[in-house]
Amino acid sequence: MLDVADNSGVKSAMCIRVKRGTSSQGNFTRSMASVGDIIWVAIKKSLPTCQLDDKKVHKCVVIRTKTPIRRPDGSYVRFDSNAAVMIDGDGNPIGTRIFGAVARELREKNYMKIISLAGEVV
């Protein structure tokens, strides 16, 4: 279970699959997601005004993890909760606001729209 940190109307979601690159047979998956990975989720809790369908699978980008992230300078950063942002087919966020801090590693993975909507980049 992870929190959804935008105003799309979804409050919590459960990860179903982690997308990690491609192979000759198609997409291959991994069991753990890190910051900047695209995951497929099932919506578990949402507001009544949410326009996303609870019965379908949706895409998210992980923006915070409890697992420490090692940076090239040797420092580690970790967050208090696992959080993601709902995205559409083009990789743009569905919501117009992002709550809480996001990791700087999203900038390296070209999620500039998420970086610009976030209040703080750690």
Predicted regions located by residue number:
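Ribosome-associated RNA-binding proteins
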Residues: 1-122
